[in-house]
């Protein structure tokens, strides 16, 4: 691979940023970060281990260097190619493409796992896609009200049958006056 802008320079003295800049300038179009790394590795004749050791530093440099611009999806370009207004539009356009791709993928439904293994205690409110409650669903069940009244009447009848022991004894109940306590508070 030849980069014309770097001809005549010693390869061992070139930084990865210089090679990336010259590479993008020569190609004239944006590139994936992985493509940039492969091209730099080929041009500088570095081993995989050398590239792995310097990739984090290079990524930091490409982010902080003012001449590069990330366009999203790990695509990089030279800032000089874009007017300031156009940069925002380019990034927004790439974001919209990402959103469209995400919308096309069907959403995965996650199965809820019961950690206790008891399937009888499923909460119906946790179910997805439950229908909304309408006024008809909220109508009162008059039969249930009648059953409740019958239960109360039966309970009252049972209480009436119970004989109370020592009903005539008086029980002393002490009542504390709370009004005196409110005057004793300190206000600082």
Swiss-Prot record:
The keyword Transcription applies. Participates in both the initiation and recycling phases of transcription. In the presence of the delta subunit, RNAP displays an increased specificity of transcription, a decreased affinity for nucleic acids, and an increased efficiency of RNA synthesis because of enhanced recycling. Residues 14-81 form the HTH HARE-type domain. Gene3D superfamilies: RNA polymerase, subunit delta, N-terminal domain. The keyword Nucleotidyltransferase applies. GO terms for biological process: DNA-templated transcription; regulation of DNA-templated transcription. Residues 118-150, 158-188 have a biased composition (Acidic residues). RNAP is composed of a core of 2 alpha, a beta and a beta' subunits. The core is associated with a delta subunit and one of several sigma factors. Signal peptide: none annotated. Belongs to the RpoE family. Disulfide bonds: none annotated. GO terms for molecular function: DNA-directed RNA polymerase activity. This is Probable DNA-directed RNA polymerase subunit delta. Keywords: DNA-directed RNA polymerase, Nucleotidyltransferase, Transcription, Transferase. Residues 96-188 are annotated as: Disordered. GO terms for cellular component: DNA-directed RNA polymerase complex.
């Amino acid at each position: 691979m030849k980069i014309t802008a770097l001809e005549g320079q010693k390869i061992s003295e070139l930084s990865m940023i210089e090679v990336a800049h010259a590479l993008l300038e020569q190609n004239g179009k944006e590139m994936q970060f992985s493509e940039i790394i492969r091209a730099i590795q080929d041009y500088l004749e570095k081993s995989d281990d050398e590239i792995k050791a310097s990739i984090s530093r290079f990524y930091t440099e490409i982010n902080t260097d003012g001449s590069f611009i990330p366009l999203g999806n790990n695509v990089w370009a030279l800032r000089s190619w874009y007017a300031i207004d156009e940069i925002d539009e380019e990034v927004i356009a790439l974001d919209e493409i990402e959103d469209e791709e995400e919308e096309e993928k069907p959403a995965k439904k996650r199965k809820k796992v019961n950690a206790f293994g008891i399937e009888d205690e499923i909460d119906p409110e946790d179910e997805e896609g439950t229908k909304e409650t309408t006024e008809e669903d909220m109508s009162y069940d008059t039969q249930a009200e009648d059953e409740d009244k019958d239960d109360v009447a039966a309970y009252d009848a049972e209480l009436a049958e119970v004989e109370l022991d020592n009903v005539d004894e008086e029980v002393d109940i002490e009542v504390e006056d709370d009004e005196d306590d409110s005057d004793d508070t300190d206000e600082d």
